[in-house]
Structures are given as C-alpha cells and as structure tokens.
Regions:
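Short glycine-rich, polar/acidic loop-and-turn segments at beta strand-coil junctions
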Residues: 41, 59-62, 97
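Short beta-strand segments at enzyme active-site cores
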Residues: 17, 53-60, 147
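A short acidic, helix-capping loop that chelates divalent metal ions and anchors anionic groups
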Residues: 23-27, 64-66, 155
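Active-site-adjacent betaalpha module
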Residues: 2-13, 43-46, 50, 68-204
C-alpha cells in the first residue's frame, strides 16, 4: 500500500492493542472484517521477538456495565495467540479509554526512557483504539506505521442518533486508512511490507 520501501528501526516498538477474547463474541459486536488479522498479528509478534525489538501489549479494562472486556469477565483475557507469545520483558499497558497513551503505566514515558521513536500499531478495533492511538502518537511526534491487515473491526451504527447512519467494518477500515495517512498521522502499510523490512535488518 506504500509507494516507497519502509524501514523498521532497530528499537521500533510493536503495539498489540486489545487483542482480547471478548472480541470473539460475535453476538455482542456484530459482523467483523479481515479474518486474517490474528494470523498477521502473530507473524509480527514472532518477527519482533526474533529480532529482539520491544513489544507493548495493551489491554482494555472496560468500565461499561455488562462489557465483555470488563476485568471480571473472561473476555478481558488476551487471545491465545498473544498469551502464548507473551514474554516477561513485554510492557503491559492497561487502559479504560481508546488511547493507549492514557493507560497504566505511562506509555509515552516508557518509550522516551528507551529512546523509541517509531511505533508499529496492530490490534482491535481498527477505527477505535488503534486509530485513536495512532492519531495521538502522530501528534506526539512518533513515526507511526499501521499494517492495516493486522487490525480488524466491526460494523457500526449510530444507535439512537437522528441520522440512522451506519458503516460496514470494511468501510470503517478504509476510512481509518484515509484518516491516518491522508491526515498525516501515520503511514498505512501491509504486514508483508513490515515483515520484509524486519527481515532485511535481521539478515543484514
């Protein structure tokens, strides 16, 4: 999706945002897009681990009544692909809002302490916590890459709003790509592009 080759910094941080079991509840969320998202996230985690780059795991602790992402709900747990790859050196950020920068511990402080200036964002939902985190990261001056095929989202409607508006998950993902790259917040890339760039540095 990019026009020029990308470079992945030696200390580029991979953010794995809200890849939690609660998002498997189709009856709760509705139709989703991109069934390959989890496979691509796993591939990126493996590449980051092999190359010794830092990984940040972000987990949403919903405060909404009845949420499948609430801490007391089984859906709060990470999906198996994350749980099986989790390492003690990974940073775990817990948040209650969309942005990963408003969580505990302080993500920006952790990145600054390690001199990290590039972030690769993956996870769920594309147009919610991934996009919000990307926008804020861009505002904070980070070089942000979003492999869109390592994210997914769900159909969305405006509920009881007067407009009766709705978009499919695929439409929302496209809107996120346009918002982020067109708005100058992040570069939209593919998992294959990122893996190729990581591989070049590993074998160099």
């Amino acid at each position: 999706m990019t026009q020029t080759a990308i470079e992945i910094a030696d200390n580029s941080a991979l953010l794995v945002i809200d890849v939690q079991k609660g998002f498997d509840a189709a009856a709760y969320w509705g139709p989703r897009d991109n069934p390959d998202a989890e496979t691509n996230i796993a591939a990126l985690m493996d590449a980051w681990r092999e190359s010794g780059r830092p990984i940040v795991l972000v987990r949403h602790a919903s405060v909404q009544p009845g949420s499948v992402l609430a801490p007391e709900h089984p859906g709060h747990a990470f999906k198996d692909l994350v749980r099986e790859r989790r390492h003690e050196d990974d940073l775990l950020v817990t948040k209650t809002v969309n942005s990963s920068f408003y969580g505990t511990p302080d993500l920006a402080a952790w990145l600054t302490d390690r001199g990290i200036g590039q972030l690769v964002l993956t996870g769920i939902q594309t147009n919610m916590c991934v996009e919000t985190t990307a926008r804020m990261a861009g505002n904070l001056g980070y070089d942000v890459l979003v492999p869109l095929d390592a994210t997914h989202t769900f159909d969305l409607a405006d509920g009881t709003g007067p407009g009766g508006l709705s978009l499919t998950a695929a439409q929302l993902a496209t809107a996120t790509a346009v918002n982020l790259q067109g708005g100058g917040f992040a570069r939209i890339v593919t998992t294959a592009e990122v893996l190729a760039a990581v591989g070049e540095r590993v074998t160099a």
